[in-house]
Amino acid sequence: MERIKELRNLMSQSRTREILTKTTVDHMAIIKKYTSGRQEKNPSLRMKWMMAMKYPITADKRITEMVPERNEQGQTLWSKMSDAGSDRVMVSPLAVTWWNRNGPMTSTVHYPKVYKTYFEKVERLKHGTFGPVHFRNQVKIRRRVDINPGHADLSAKEAQDVIMEVVFPNEVGARILTSESQLTITKEKKEELQDCKISPLMVAYMLERELVRKTRFLPVAGGTSSVYIEVLHLTQGTCWEQMYTPGGEVRNDDIDQSLIIAARNIVRRAAVSADPLASLLEMCHSTQIGGTRMVDILRQNPTEEQAVDICKAAMGLRISSSFSFGGFTFKRTSGSSIKREEELLTGNLQTLKIRVHEGYEEFTMVGKRATAILRKATRRLVQLIVSGRDEQSVAEAIIVAMVFSQEDCMIKAVRGDLNFVNRANQRLNPMHQLLRHFQKDAKVLFQNWGIEHIDNVMGMIGVLPDMTPSTEMSMRGIRVSKMGVDEYSSTERVVVSIDRFLRVRDQRGNVLLSPEEVSETQGTEKLTITYSSSMMWEINGPESVLVNTYQWIIRNWETVKIQWSQNPTMLYNKMEFEPFQSLVPKAIRGQYSGFVRTLFQQMRDVLGTFDTTQIIKLLPFAAAPPKQSRMQFSSLTVNVRGSGMRILVRGNSPVFNYNKTTKRLTILGKDAGTLIEDPDEGTSGVESAVLRGFLILGKEDRRYGPALSINELSNLAKGEKANVLIGQGDVVLVMKRKRDSSILTDSQTATKRIRMAIN
């Protein structure tokens, strides 16, 4: 009562009433907020308020000489008043319009080059298609996305050096341009920007947009590639989405997409080889994506995906500390655990040795189509809050979390034996055994889990064992939420180690990744992936193996030929012949190999029977472990095009066809390259044609090193001796003549001498 009297008393004074009714801001904190600091607190209001003034812009004094005081309509363009606190002039927005219409023109040739990213964006939007708007609840989760389409992938430091070199070439300061991409970009930009009149600062800023990946942590539902993110504000709101198809693709998105496909293919292939880690490294180093070496892309590209991270770990690069299980990325947000080996019995009384995590922990789980928060204790799921695009996605997340919890009722829900194997036919580890089992059929798991009554909590509902939603009951500890769980935002990278089976561990020994986690999804790469490694020949099927094997022999014919005559066993063991074995029927591989090796031995022993085409044709068959038998073959079978096709031992066939006149080899109708036979192969003149200018001294002499090919002879100095491999696969010792006059007689004597040297 007293307070009210006091207030009435105050209000009776006219000054009080005036202050309270006329002054809008009456709170010190608010006044402080809007008046302290240089940061503009309400930029859009400030802009509107400024633009409502007559002269909201300041300009350099020179403007008064270049722009008239009034325009054609008689409106004043600038004020004679100076700007307070600077020696600039106050200018009307109309002056800008006048300048744009009547101001001086400069060359516009550099604009599309400097503002390349903007011009390209306009093109993408022009050709993009906007579809209907749908109103529905948007489950958005914050993900780290690329907001800058069309960039290269240089690090900030690399880009800085390039920009300094292009924009301020004469500035002092050490700049080291080392990487291939730095040098290429610098050269290209220097040429493009010759005589450029645009302010260097602007050029530098625009170059940065082109060279460096910029990422932001944004709420997204739907596409995350940069061409979708640039229109995020047009395609998704809180309760609506608009369908959109970009009007063009950008290289950075294509690289990200192709990198993931290449990495998945490589990890899958490496996992089944004898030494997975060595194979993986060999393939990463010999693969190109869109003409750039894969290892260079891996060093610069921050894409986080299981296969990509395994490749990075193998190269000794740092990766994210989160771990992967069942296709979900787990990040521990609190708690800790210790690991202990325990033996558990499944519902089928099979013993599983499992590393049990003891202790209370909380995780976020982020997958492609669902996200969740998981709280667990030792072998017990305390709570799981899931959100997902659809019922199927929610179910996937629940299965992964149930298996991860290691609960007893999950282990007991196993029906039948667990014997899942990976691509290399090795048994999966117990946790992945369980995962595969329930991914196939989770009915028993869900039925046995148990259900509970639930309280009504805003934004959450229950889910029953048959995946129907309910507000009364739910599977124990499990709720479905409308809100998504944000991806882990940190870009922190940690040092990891990798073992030869491609299991990646952090420094405390926790497994972060393994080949089991690599997705089996097949996609078509946007950029050409060139796998030079023979291990990847089979990726495009049997025909590709066949063509690649023969192309490899032809490309390396000079060395292959020497090995064929001197060290055949080493040649037969070459890994390049490994993929070919899968084309040869298993039952007969050994016999074919024995037969071909015997045939080759005869060729080495009998003068004049060396036959380039035949050696190339049959060589891959000799790579299998040979079985000695008396069997002779006139044709050998390979399994391509879904059936057995024949390669004739003597003569051409649709599989292997050599055209003597054009010297072209075609495999299954595809060109496999040019095959240069030894001159006049199989005729006695071969030696003379080859050995002009050399004197034949006799049989091979090991003291003079390994046999050279005919092509390598030209490097000999006059009077120098060497062993040389001649047409028939025989090796003789020769000396380069000291005088050129006697060359003619060499041809006649060569034949006789070779016969003597060999026999």
Curated annotation (Swiss-Prot):
InterPro entries: Flu_PB2_2nd (IPR049110), Flu_PB2_6th (IPR049114), Flu_PB2_C (IPR049115), Flu_PB2_CAP-bd (IPR048298), Flu_PB2_middle (IPR049111), Flu_PB2_N (IPR049106), INV_PB2 (IPR001591), PB2_helical (IPR049113)
Site positions for Mammalian adaptation: K627
Example of a GO cellular component annotation carried by this entry: host cell mitochondrion
Domain of life of the native organism: Viruses
Originating organism: Influenza A virus (strain A/England/878/1969 H3N2)
The keyword Chaperone is assigned to this record: no
Gene name as annotated: PB2
Gene3D superfamilies: Polymerase Basic Protein 2, C-terminal domain (3.30.30.90)
MF GO annotations: RNA binding; RNA-directed RNA polymerase activity
Subcellular location: Virion; Host nucleus; Host mitochondrion
Description of how the protein assembles with itself and partners: Influenza RNA polymerase is composed of three subunits: PB1, PB2 and PA. Interacts (via N-terminus) with PB1 (via C-terminus). Interacts with nucleoprotein NP (via N-terminus). Interacts (via N-terminus) with host MAVS (via N-terminus); this interaction inhibits host innate immune response.
Protein name as catalogued: Polymerase basic protein 2
Keyword ATP-binding: no
Family recorded in the similarity comment: Belongs to the influenza viruses PB2 family.
Biological processes, Gene Ontology terms: 7-methylguanosine mRNA capping; cap snatching; DNA-templated transcription; symbiont-mediated suppression of host cytoplasmic pattern recognition receptor signaling pathway via inhibition of MAVS activity; symbiont-mediated suppression of host gene expression; symbiont-mediated suppression of host mRNA transcription via inhibition of RNA polymerase II activity; viral RNA genome replication
Keywords on record: Cap snatching, Eukaryotic host gene expression shutoff by virus, Eukaryotic host transcription shutoff by virus, Host gene expression shutoff by virus, Host mitochondrion, Host nucleus, Host-virus interaction, Inhibition of host innate immune response by virus, Inhibition of host MAVS by virus, Inhibition of host RLR pathway by virus, Inhibition of host RNA polymerase II by virus, mRNA capping, mRNA processing, Viral immunoevasion, Viral transcription, Virion
SUPFAM superfamilies documented for this protein: PB2 C-terminal domain-like (SSF160453)
Role of this protein: Plays an essential role in transcription initiation and cap-stealing mechanism, in which cellular capped pre-mRNAs are used to generate primers for viral transcription. Recognizes and binds the 7-methylguanosine-containing cap of the target pre-RNA which is subsequently cleaved after 10-13 nucleotides by the viral protein PA. Plays a role in the initiation of the viral genome replication and modulates the activity of the ribonucleoprotein (RNP) complex.
Pfam family of the protein (one): Flu_PB2_1st
Chain location of the short sequence motif Nuclear localization signal per the record: 736-739
